[in-house]
Amino acid sequence: EKELTEQKYPFKHVYTGISKTVKRALPLKAIKRIKELDLTLKPHLDYARDVFLFSFYTRGMSFIDMAYLKKSDLKNGVIIYRRKKTGQQLTIKWEKCMEDIIAKYNGCSTTQYLLPIITNPCADERMQYRNAISRINVALKEVARLAGLNMPLTMHCARHCWASIA
């Protein structure tokens, strides 16, 4: 009779599944706290907060798409733009909350872009985008602290917030 060997399971302590991702979404009351912060004495934080909220208001628009959003993309009460990542065309109804943010920074950019992210037509656009997202993410961490949030705030959070609330 053949002898049976005991099963050894050499990888029983090795995790081979998919680990749970950290939730990046904030509850609506946290978004409200961010919105209601008085940042008038800290314009760089005010700007970062506004860009974050603009992303949230525009159904979680990615920062790259916001950076390259043109004034001509806004027509007849809608924004029509093509996602950089996928090429998918999206249409978003233009709301007063979006208008308020754009109006606040209206004189800041003489470029074709809607938001003052890429502001220097003579400089490399990709570099301006990278520098802007870096500065804004640093500022958003301070905004989160001032709002009493116990998680770091980033531009990517705005996408998750919208997706979890929608």
Outline where the language-model segments fall.
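Basic, Lys/Arg- and aromatic-enriched nucleic-acid-binding interface segment
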Residues: L4-F63
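Short, contiguous acidic/charged loop-to-helix segments that flank catalytic cores in large enzymes
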Residues: T21, L39-P43, I80-K93, A123-A132, ...
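Active-site lining segments that contact anionic ligands and/or coordinate catalytic metals
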Residues: K29-I31, A48-L53, N76, G87-Q89, ...
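Active-site/catalytic core of tyrosine-dependent DNA strand-transfer enzymes
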Residues: A30-I31, E95-N150
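Short, basic (Lys/Arg/His-rich) helix/loop patches that form interaction surfaces
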Residues: E36, T40-P43, C108, N137-A166
